[in-house]
Amino acid sequence: MITTTETEKANSITERERCLNVAKRIVCTDRNEQYGEPEDNFDVISEYWAAYLNSKYKVGVPLDSGDVAHMMVLFKMGRITTAKEYKEDNYIDLAGYAACAMECAANKAKIVREISEKINRENVDISPKNV
């Protein structure tokens, strides 16, 4: 069970605020201390999952860190849907994975933007005949 801090008790915060506070504490401190940056960890997981899917189904499935974060959100939704009883940590984990997914998407968008700017700045011809 996730414990409520004394500050949270004193401030009479809402459940949604407490959920986000705990998720933030877990994702931004506890998790990083144990596993490192989520995106780095999810990149490794994506390689394992892609290799498994390729081996099992004989198809190349490109996965990235964002895919792992999204699938972990779905995993948590499945847990919530089939749980015999309410467990708050499922919702806290769900919020944490959603935050990680957002960070992965933002980082990917930044890389795409930087590449696009470089192509435009250097007038690189990326038509199929020149690639």
Predicted regions span which residues?
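Intrinsically disordered, low-complexity regulatory regions
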Residues: 1-131
